[in-house]
Amino acid sequence: MLTLGRKALQVPILQGGMGVGVSLGGLAGAVAACGGMGCISTADAGYREPDFARDPASANHRALTAEIRKAKEIAKGAGMVAINAMVATQDYAAAIRTAVEAGVDAVVSGAGLPLELPGIVGTTDVAIAPIVSSGRAAKLILRRWAKEFGRTADFVVIEGCKAGGHLGFSEDDLLAGKCQTLDDILPEVLAEVKPFEAQFGHSIPVFVAGGVYTGADMAHFTAMGAAGVQLATRFITTYECDASQGYKDVLLNARPEDVRIIHSPVGMPGRALNTPLVQALAEGTRFPPRHCARCLKTCDPAKVPYCITHALIEAVKGNVEDGLFFCGANVGRLDRMHTVQELMDELVTEWRQNQ
């Protein structure tokens, strides 16, 4: 049993948030039901709502509330249900407040430094966690939270350079293979959280993500001092994952050589499959947005090479021609569909065998 804020995990496994629409209430609830932490992505959670094109904010908040309630119903009190909220999104604070009102157990936040997160969550029992890629980032965030809000993190997630989606490393370092490894970053972050554990009188569990694939990987990092791990790509090929089967099939058929580092309109590099869209972008083709959902703080529709909302929605539907398929570095190892329970059991069994 691992305590995170006022709640507890029976299994130290987090399911990483995946948007648009890949991790919603179905997947998050199934992971929580197994004793882990299921995570709903707030990114355009309402993309299937009839009024999404006309009023994306209302559609997203309505859907987010429904997905959290769905996950909680599936979990039946086991594990924890969290959201992943990206700092770079326009409705960042509003989405978090909606989730808190809906009864979410935790907020995990990255794609930027979540410096204001404690103030947004307020004086609630909701656990909060930053996603970091270095000890320096962890120190900066926790120092700000302590000084401005008199609060610290309930846990921390390290996302390494092998993660899927948006990455907290420079594009040059990613392409050159010069990024710090999780083996390098974990001791740094563990050292940086120690003073805050002493100051606030409770432990701050640290989870590692990005390239974690097996229970043996989990055993390796817990032996180094991590409380547990976060996985995302492996959960895509579960029956409970909220994406279409077409989306899952694209990842199941992916080879290691299909993975690319791309530039996202979010302003960060990302890891995705080399689909026709990615190939066209690499050749300099621009796909002007047909409609702006106002999803990102920094996006200029007049200049952006493509609309990431449109590309991710097409992906989750299984449209391989027009979709952007984010994935982790180990996507080529995916070889079958399974249930969330089967995956969780496999990971925990391997973890215990390798301790």
Model-derived segments and their meaning:
Residues 1-199:
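Active-site entrance/lid segments in N-terminal catalytic domains of soluble metabolic enzymes
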Residues 14, 163-182, 186-207, 213-355:
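Conserved active-site-proximal phosphate/metal-binding subdomains
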Residues 22, 212-213:
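Residue-level detector of alpha-helix initiation sites
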